[in-house]
Amino acid sequence: MRRALVASVISIGLAASLISANPAAADGPINATQFGMHIPQLSQGLVPGVNYGSVRLWDSGVAWGLVQQGKNKFWWNGLDASIANANSQGVDIMYVLGSTPTWAATNKKQGTYPYKGAASVPSTKDWKKWVTAVVKRHGGSIGSYQIWNEANLTDFWAGTPKQMAKLTQVASKIIRKYDPTAKVVSASSTVRLQSAYKRFFPAYLKELKKVKWPVDVISVHTYPKGNGTPEDRSIYIDQVNAQMKKSKVPASKQLWDTEVNYGIKGPGKIKGQKIGGDTAAAWTAQTYLENIVKGVGRSYWYFWDAPNSLLGITMQDGYPGAIGYQTAYMWLNNSFYSCTEGNVNVCQLGDAVQPEVVVWATQGSGTYTVPANATVQCDAMNRCSAVTPGDSIAIGSMPLWFGTAEQNATNQATLLNRPVASP
């Protein structure tokens, strides 16, 4: 993304939920890296007011052409500072290797962001030199390297899926040689512009298969349309998972969502929308809950900054979106889980003896029976109140957590200090 720019009512208990259709379970606990972020001012030392586990370096002044400003001219200050600051915060780093510098562009009219010629296909020689320079300098500090941003859009990539697969293969060999523990992440593809997605994504997977899958991660961007909701995003994820299965992507390759927000205008004449209050908190928390249900390894929220005209949900201190993000982190981080999709989605966290439970409706509404051990419920705005086991609770798009007072106290102790929501 360029910076300019719930059904029928049911009554369900925990036991029933865990034997329903479409369960999702994990062998290990949810890692903090699930919670990704974009931080445009990272090089200046900005520290977000939420817990997060990974950062994607894009739209932060460190793109290829801003670092390598000529064939033999490098300006490393911004990238060095961004990596140092991310390391000091203890978060995993993803670096996006594209886009083509103006000086290396064969056609300077192809792409304008973040500079002229950015969508042009670079020469293999220039690409090798660049990737080698980055990996040799920062190998061991960067956790994953993403090949390109939104390569299904001609604003960012004017080449073919085959050419992108070639760049992917070339970069992967260099990364495996000099930074073998790092992950290689495919070029990302947006989903909401379906014509561009269908033109690029299946073909790119086909070409990656031909060169023996030189990636560890398949990446997409799951922004829904300007008037879209988390339900629409969930449909996109199902579509991507189906295509990955059809393309016979090995099960060892994770799916990451490397950009997400809501309310961004388009495609076409679809207007954007500003999303605040309870809706912002609910949708943000739903995003990360849906990830564990759908098998998405990470989502990088776009982005931590002041309110602007581009994005529907503001991610900033005190805003509901940030509180929803932080609350989801508090509930999920380091938890084992078992989830069930339905009209009311149910995720059991922790052990089966005294579980914590999170429930929400992706579409419509329903009811849920408070589990036997639960005495407290909290919503995604982190508002908590007492409940009685066996009571029937109305469930909508606002995720609700159920557990004991002791479990809630432990959760609350993980929160960072931040301003009380007011916007």
Residue ranges and their predicted role:
Residues M1-A26:
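Secretory targeting and sorting signals
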Residues D27-G61:
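Boundary/entry segment of secreted carbohydrate-active catalytic domains
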Residues V50-V215, S219-K225:
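Substrate-binding cleft and catalytic face of glycoside hydrolase catalytic domains
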Residues Y223-I270, I292-V293, G297-W301:
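Glycoside hydrolase catalytic-domain groove-lining segments
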Residues N261-M330, C339-N345:
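Aromatic/acidic polysaccharide-binding cleft in carbohydrate-active enzymes
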Residues E341-N373, A380-N382:
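Carbohydrate-binding surface patches
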Residues S385-P423:
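C-terminal beta-strand-rich structural cap/linker in extracellular carbohydrate-active enzymes
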